[in-house]
């Protein structure tokens, strides 16, 4: 047996061909016209068949089976945190386009309280009876975000990504399409969930390159999220401390609404920073660190304090690719590329620490 989807009505054809018999109609399996329009646009823009996009949207065909659904959350009365003056202004800027399509960029330095601002917007959308989708660039961020969400709202959101179990995915899918699940936090694939009454999309860390999918159906989740918001005629909020060049350019051209948090929450000071240009500093033989940096490190170590180094790259190669078939090794836990470390001859995940021995390279 196969599950089919009625896509459109056409005039009867005079051609003779066999048509499979319809065994039954699935009552709790219905996609609205808005999502159909988005799938058509997604397919044409990314040069991929509608069938492949539908497969991403529908997932396991057993989604149609009657299963336990999420209970609809009650209205949220208030948050536990109070917004400061700058945050209130940014919130008002985001509210300007509440019931229509508009891309808004919320920019702010790290620790400025951007999350608090869009959490307040989410509260308003949820209380209006509509659904909200929050997109995050990496799978491992969803669990961290889940705890933060629980702290603010008092209930756990649904999490959607490739590592979520089939049973839970079916539960989320059915609850989303029936409108009983109001909020989903997920990675790229959550963008194609069949929401019944979507009211807002939030794309956190919009600058992150992980939003671009390079395998299978190739697309950029940020651009597709904007397209879906346009089709749904709802606002979308892009959140970032360091916006992408594309987003920044659209702000400059007045295409996007823009608001910014210029200071950290509770006026917490930024750390002191200094730039040492190695092209202007003479280094000693076999040294790759300037004397000024070494002296500073020694001063902290003498006080029994710690020093943390951030390196721009670890490992011999950021990923391995097969010349014949194009296969790339992904971490089974995090779904990111494994980095090849030549000294230990292993592929290593820099997120979870997973190591895979590679005999022949």
Identify the residue ranges that each predicted region occupies:
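A polyampholytic, Gly/Pro-enriched intrinsically disordered region
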Residues: 177-184, 279-285, 357-359
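Accessory, non-ATPase domains that flank or precede helicase/AAA+ motor cores in DNA-metabolism machines
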Residues: 1-240, 247-248, 252-268, 302
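Conserved helicase/translocase motor-coupling segment
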Residues: 307-361
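Structural signal for conserved beta-strand scaffold positions within catalytic alpha/beta enzyme cores
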Residues: 8, 159-161, 238, 260, ...
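Glycine-rich phosphate-binding "P-loop"
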Residues: 78-79, 103-110, 210, 273-287, ...
């Amino acid at each position: 047996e196969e599950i089919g989807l009625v896509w459109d009505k056409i005039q009867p054809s005079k051609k003779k061909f066999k048509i499979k018999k319809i065994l039954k109609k699935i009552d709790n399996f219905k996609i609205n016209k808005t999502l159909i329009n988005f799938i058509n646009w997604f397919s044409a823009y990314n040069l991929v068949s509608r069938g492949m996009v539908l497969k991403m949207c529908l997932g396991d065909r057993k989604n149609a089976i009657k299963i336990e659904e999420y209970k609809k959350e009650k209205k949220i009365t208030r948050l536990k945190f109070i917004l400061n003056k700058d945050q209130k202004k940014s919130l008002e800027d985001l509210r300007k386009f509440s019931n229509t399509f508009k891309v808004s960029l919320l920019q702010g330095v790290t620790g400025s309280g951007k999350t608090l601002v869009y959490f307040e917007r989410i509260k308003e959308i949820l209380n209006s009876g509509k659904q909200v989708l929050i997109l995050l660039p990496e799978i491992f961020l969803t669990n961290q975000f889940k705890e933060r969400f629980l702290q603010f709202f008092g209930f756990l959101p649904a999490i959607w990504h490739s590592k979520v179990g089939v049973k839970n995915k079916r539960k989320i899918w059915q609850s989303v399409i029936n409108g009983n699940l109001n909020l989903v936090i997920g990675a790229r694939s959550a963008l194609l969930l069949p929401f019944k009454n979507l009211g807002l999309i939030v794309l956190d860390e919009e600058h992150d390159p992980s939003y671009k999918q390079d395998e299978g159906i190739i697309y950029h989740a940020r651009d597709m999220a904007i397209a879906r918001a346009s089709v749904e005629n709802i606002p979308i909020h892009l959140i970032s401390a360091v916006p992408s060049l594309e987003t920044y350019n659209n702000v400059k051209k007045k295409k996007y609404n823009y608001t910014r948090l210029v200071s950290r929450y509770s006026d917490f000071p930024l750390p002191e920073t200094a730039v040492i240009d190695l092209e202007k500093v003479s280094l000693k033989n076999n040294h790759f660190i300037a004397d000024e940096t070494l002296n500073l490190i020694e001063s902290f170590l003498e006080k029994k304090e710690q020093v943390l180094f951030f390196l721009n790259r670890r490992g011999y190669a950021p990923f391995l690719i097969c010349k014949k078939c194009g296969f790339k090794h992904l971490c089974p836990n995090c779904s990111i590329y494994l980095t090849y470390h030549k000294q230990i001859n292993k592929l290593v995940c820099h997120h979870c620490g997973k190591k895979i021995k590679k005999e022949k390279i």
